[in-house]
Amino acid sequence: PLLSVLGEYQESDKHFRSYMGFRSAEYVNMFGMYDRRSDHYACATDDGSFGAKGNAVQLFFGDFENAKPDVILACGPTPMLRALKAGLQERGVRVPCYVSLEERMGCGIGACLVCVCKKSGGQNARVCKDGPVFAIDEVELEWQI
């Protein structure tokens, strides 16, 4: 979903910094697509076989002072989004942040409730119908059915 955002704004005066993480070099994909559309691109692998050793969240926070983002867009597995949310809270970052949740979706219309996530305040949301993009403070990333 983030590649489409980059494509949509490519002709604008907006600047994008992309940080991607993979398990190892064999899993790296779409490198050129993000590299060409971003003002800054950084990649990490868990084992250091491509780019920096580490993960995308570490890359992001390592470059945060240079980036000075107006908005943060993130997509990835729940543990990564959880680490991003914790890092933002620990640093007192008040920049709007939106996450695209990766959940199994059974029916795609919200009827089966397979993709339910818990929102802040105790309500539930259906990722397929109410999302999949939410403000990071709007969802509880620790909770799973």
Model-based region annotation:
Residues 1-4, 78-80, 102-133:
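Local cysteine-cluster metal-coordination motifs and their immediate loop/turn environment
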